[in-house]
Amino acid sequence: MDSTAGSDASTPTNHTVSSKKRRGRPPKGSYAAYGSSDDDDEEYSGRTRRRNRNTRPRVSAPSSSSTVVPKDLYSHRATLEDDELNFGVVDPEGEKKVNELGYLNGGREYRCRTFTCLGRGNRLYMLSTEPARAMGYRDSYLLFLKHRSLHKIIVDDSEKWDLIERNIIPHSYKGRAVGIVAARSIFREFGARIIVGGRRIVDDYWEGEFRARGFVEGELADPDDKLPPPGMPYNRNQYVAWHGASAVYHPQPSLEAQLPAAARKRKKEPPKDATWLFQHAKATAAYNNDITKYLVQKQDIGYFEPHTNLLHVPLNTQPTKTHWIQAKTGTECPAPKLDILVALNSDVAPQVSIANIPPSVYASCPLHVQEAIRKRQEQEIRSIRLNSMY
């Protein structure tokens, strides 16, 4: 609608337009309806034409994960027949790939589990959650919301107990609403994407529609699907909730991917021919060093024994006997003095004694260093004598 029409529709005929410009930005709609002068119309005329011009719609390339159905499919009135919504539109080539009960022809296999239901004949059905997860949906609600050609069936108690006895659903589902869907309608909706190793047009139901939209014949419909080696069965349990189906839409990163980039690069690079033995020896020495440090720390702290709820220490680190000397009667003994010696023991390196070092070795050291060495030698000699007495 142009600005003149908007002015006639929104402005009374007896309204007097002021010649004074209004302050502020004009509204996004018609400028004539805003009560502006002719100068205002000329000022914003180019802007109005630029805003209202029609843009060309973008044409996107066909996606391998898109669902293709005839454009006029939903314009027909649907009727419920054999647990399916029948729109009265079929593809002659697609009918050759599946029969009326949902069984596939030509050696094709469904990616999800199929089964028959009690009281519904030999028609094939699927649990609604399994094709939903196979197509990338978190639950069946989104599946039926976005694909209107599918019909959800809620099984009754007798059908539910029959599925439990046949190990199709677990016993914990006895109090829950279980939904199923006809396998034939799933194939009509998703085509090659629901087929094991399905290829476009070759395994699609709406073959003519896929050709018209420019899909490549023979292309894999789902390149991300994990196909088994030749001769091995396809893993249909990956879409079953009680078999870890959450891994389908919650992929976990590998342990190698969680490592830093430098560690991944170092792990991938093979050791050089000239240094591989050195690298192994270096890693082994570091591992042995860690073990030694851990054992020394455990000896200082002790080993916790859960049955006695006590910390146990090695027997060879504890005293085994004591020696008492009785003082003579009538003699006065000086009050004993308590000397506290703080020793810092290294956790890794063993203790080194300097009692047997000759003076010629440290004769060139400063005087205060020589004095410290002599005091340490005297302490060690005194400690050795005390230990030899007991």
Swiss-Prot record:
<comment type="subunit">
    <text>Component of the RSC complex composed of at least arp9, arp42, rsc1, rsc4, rsc7, rsc9, rsc58, sfh1, snf21, ssr1, ssr2, ssr3 and ssr4. The complex probably interacts with histone and histone variant components of centromeric chromatin.</text>
</comment>
<feature type="compositionally biased region" description="Low complexity">
    <location>
        <begin position="57"/>
        <end position="70"/>
    </location>
</feature>
<dbReference type="Pfam" id="PF08624">
    <property type="entry name" value="CRC_subunit"/>
</dbReference>
<feature type="region of interest" description="Disordered">
    <location>
        <begin position="1"/>
        <end position="72"/>
    </location>
</feature>
<keyword id="KW-0597">Phosphoprotein</keyword>
<keyword id="KW-0156">Chromatin regulator</keyword>
<dbReference type="GO" id="GO:0006338">
    <property type="term" value="P:chromatin remodeling"/>
</dbReference>
<dbReference type="GO" id="GO:0016586">
    <property type="term" value="C:RSC-type complex"/>
</dbReference>
<dbReference type="GO" id="GO:0005634">
    <property type="term" value="C:nucleus"/>
</dbReference>
<feature type="compositionally biased region" description="Polar residues">
    <location>
        <begin position="1"/>
        <end position="17"/>
    </location>
</feature>
<comment type="similarity">
    <text>Belongs to the RSC7/SWP82 family. RSC7 subfamily.</text>
</comment>
<feature type="modified residue" description="Phosphoserine">
    <location>
        <position position="36"/>
    </location>
</feature>
<dbReference type="GO" id="GO:0031490">
    <property type="term" value="F:chromatin DNA binding"/>
</dbReference>
<keyword id="KW-0539">Nucleus</keyword>
<comment type="function">
    <text>Component of the chromatin structure remodeling complex (RSC), which is involved in transcription regulation and nucleosome positioning. Controls particularly membrane and organelle development genes.</text>
</comment>
<dbReference type="GO" id="GO:0045815">
    <property type="term" value="P:transcription initiation-coupled chromatin remodeling"/>
</dbReference>
<dbReference type="GO" id="GO:0000785">
    <property type="term" value="C:chromatin"/>
</dbReference>
<keyword id="KW-0805">Transcription regulation</keyword>
<keyword id="KW-0804">Transcription</keyword>
<dbReference type="GO" id="GO:0006368">
    <property type="term" value="P:transcription elongation by RNA polymerase II"/>
</dbReference>
<feature type="modified residue" description="Phosphoserine">
    <location>
        <position position="37"/>
    </location>
</feature>
<dbReference type="InterPro" id="IPR013933">
    <property type="entry name" value="CRC_Rsc7/Swp82"/>
</dbReference>
<protein>
    <recommendedName>
        <fullName>Chromatin structure-remodeling complex subunit rsc7</fullName>
    </recommendedName>
</protein>
<feature type="compositionally biased region" description="Basic residues">
    <location>
        <begin position="47"/>
        <end position="56"/>
    </location>
</feature>
